[in-house]
C-alpha cells in the first residue's frame, strides 16, 4: 500500500466528521491535487471508501467502508 493511500485512509478514519476532498488534500502537503483525487477515486472503485455528495459543501464527503474499518481494527 502506498504512503498516500495509507495516509488518506488514516485521515478519513481519524476525522471527526466525514472529510471532504479539500480537507483531505490540505492535510497531505506532499501530494498533488491530481494524486489525491486519483487515489480517492481508486479507493472508492475498490470499495475501500464510500463517498456521498454534500450540497451545502458542494463537495463529496468520504468515509471508510465497513470492510476497511474491520481490517483497521484488527
Name what the model sees in each region.
Residues 1-10, 58, 73:
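Short alpha-helical segments that sit at the start of domains
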Residues 1-2, 17-18, 33, 61:
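Alpha-helix N-cap/helix-initiation sites
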Residues 10-16:
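Short, locally clustered residues in the helix-turn-helix/winged-helix DNA-binding domain
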Residues 17-27:
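Short acidic, hydrophobic short linear motifs in intrinsically disordered regions
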Residues 30-45:
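Short amphipathic alpha-helical interaction segments
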Residues 44-54:
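A short, conserved structural fragment
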Residues 54-74:
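Short, cationic-aromatic polyanion-contact patches
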Amino acid at each position: 500500500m502506498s504512503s498516500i493511500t495509507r495516509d488518506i485512509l488514516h485521515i478519513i478514519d481519524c476525522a471527526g466528521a466525514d472529510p471532504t476532498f479539500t480537507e483531505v488534500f490540505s492535510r497531505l502537503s506532499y501530494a498533488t491535487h491530481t494524486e489525491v483525487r486519483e487515489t480517492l477515486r481508486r479507493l472508492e472503485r475498490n470499495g475501500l471508501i464510500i463517498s456521498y455528495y454534500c450540497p451545502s459543501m458542494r463537495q463529496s464527503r468520504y468515509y471508510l467502508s465497513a470492510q476497511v474499518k474491520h481490517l483497521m481494527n484488527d
